[in-house]
């Protein structure tokens, strides 16, 4: 899932610590929402929602329909600004590769969002259907239920889900640290290479000067 370059959402900034928009960005998003709301009902129906997501993402028709059903909590065929705001935060978190951190910071809302039946647990099927929203790979999904389904009922309650988000965040931080260390190591190797080039260049100049003096 990717945002369309140059679309309105491309210019919104998400705080990387709390995974929320600033008040200024929320106000801008609210104005944008009202522009999309051509019927002036303070809601977006499925048609408006489809055209919006088709314009700002590369999601297909089936995925857009699934997201609408996920956000239409009261099953009235419309979503309000609150649901719209949640969606935008998810899209921006995905764009900034903050999916794990977003789930950790907002574990309760995400859990309630994926708990489609309202039974205070999430099944593997729900995760499978919506894993594209949080960039969860198939193997990660299998590992999730193998490692965190403590009760063994193939369902995650909130505590199990929270443990999963903590683990993912720690893993993500460790992955970023290792990537940063590798980049630093490459930079050091580049500097060593530059120093060696300088040394060889100076050595060449010095040898040339000695040769010139011997001729004289």
Curated annotation (Swiss-Prot):
Superkingdom to which the source organism belongs = Eukaryota
Which UniProt keywords are given for this protein, alphabetically ordered? Calcium, Calmodulin-binding, Cell projection, Cilium, Cytoplasm, Differentiation, Flagellum, Metal-binding, Repeat, Spermatogenesis
- Amino-acid positions noted as binding Ca(2+) 2 in the UniProt annotation, renumbered to this chain: 149, 153, 160
Q: Which residues form the EF-hand domain?
A: 59-94, 100-135, 136-171
**Gene Ontology process terms (BP):** flagellated sperm motility; sperm capacitation; spermatogenesis
- What is the annotated localization of this protein? Cytoplasm; Cell projection, Cilium, Flagellum
Name the phenotypic consequences of knocking out this gene. Answer: Mice are normal but males show severe male subfertility despite normal sperm morphology. Subfertility is caused by defects in sperm motility: spermatozoa have a lower basal level of intracellular calcium and aberrant Ca(2+) homeostasis.
Q: Which GO terms describe its molecular function?
A: calcium ion binding; calcium ion sensor activity; calmodulin binding
Q: Which Gene3D superfamilies does this one have? A: EF-hand
Task: Tell me the residue numbers annotated for binding Ca(2+) 1.
Answer: 60, 62, 69
GO CC aspect terms? CatSper complex; cytoplasm; sperm principal piece
Tissue expression, as annotated, is: Testis-specific.
Role according to the record? Auxiliary component of the CatSper complex, a complex involved in sperm cell hyperactivation. pH-dependent Ca(2+) sensor required to activate the CatSper channel. Sperm cell hyperactivation is needed for sperm motility which is essential late in the preparation of sperm for fertilization. Associates with the CatSper complex via direct interaction with CATSPERZ, and senses intracellular Ca(2+). Together with CATSPERZ, associates with the CatSper channel pore and is required for the two-row structure of each single CatSper channel.
This protein's assembly is summarised as: Component of the CatSper complex or CatSpermasome composed of the core pore-forming members CATSPER1, CATSPER2, CATSPER3 and CATSPER4 as well as auxiliary members CATSPERB, CATSPERG2, CATSPERD, CATSPERE, CATSPERZ, C2CD6/CATSPERT, SLCO6C1, TMEM249, TMEM262 and EFCAB9. HSPA1 may be an additional auxiliary complex member. The core complex members CATSPER1, CATSPER2, CATSPER3 and CATSPER4 form a heterotetrameric channel.
Q: What is this protein called?
A: EF-hand calcium-binding domain-containing protein 9
* Gene name of the encoded protein: Efcab9
